[in-house]
Amino acid sequence: MTVGRGSNKKTSTTTSSFGVSKRESHDASKYYDSKLYQGIPKVTDVGDPQEFPEFLRDSLVCGDSRDMSMIPPNSVQLMVTSPPYNVSKEYDEDLSLQEYLSMLKDVFTETYRVLAPGGRAVINVANVGRKPYIPLTSYINMIMLEIGFLMRGEIIWDKSASAGTSCAWGSFKSASNPCLRDVHEYILVYCKGDFKLERTKQERAEGREDTIEKQEFIDFTKSIWRFPTASAKRIGHPAPFPEELPRRCIEFHTFKGDVVLDPFMGSGSTALAAKHTGRSYIGYDISQEYVDLANQRLL
């Protein structure tokens, strides 16, 4: 009896509507050519990367980030920010929802201009209110797609370990009007033009290298992150976000020496994270008080 050997050639897989569990020899082209993906931003040529001016590296600007004309186009590798929630205090006026969203669109349009090809934009935001609930994440997603950003995904920041118990419960132990207690925020991730951030062999040889450790990289690819909030009293800002948030984004999305922008710098957490990870930073805030606070924290 002759026993023939079976073929060792692997059969490639394709993406179905429900995805697949294994990715070896995987072809997703048919899926991404489907009607589901029609009408949304696609990979496109946005020009060549430009040099970021040396005199702007590691600087904080007291000014409105709707005008970042001093920054050349295609010169910033990452934007990480948490837009202000208390708009009336930060902008000295009580903006309507539409005015607030219009302001964000102006800022993120400027962000798109200054980002390098493949550069990433990361926005930390929480939905607000209860009567009714305002889904800021949905509005921001639409704004970013209208501008032309490619969406890469979203991360749930699980804050439950540091969440307090004092809050509006609605009706307690009753179906009359129970309210959800948000113990999470969102981290929305986008990119400009292409999903890949280019790096030449010469740049790598000159020190533009990855700094993230293997286990952290594996952990950061997961869509749920867990770390505590920052103390407003300790930092001196009404809504600070912890340095851990921008640090993770910076390590995950940039190389050493890259430039990180925060158009709503606030207390300076993004600048601190950039400094501590070997990146350069540029931040904007309209409040001189917060610019001074951020500069003090950077000493």
Residue positions per predicted region:
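Core catalytic lobe of class I
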Residues: 1-293
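C-terminal helical cap(s) of enzyme catalytic domains, especially alpha/beta-barrels
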Residues: 295-299
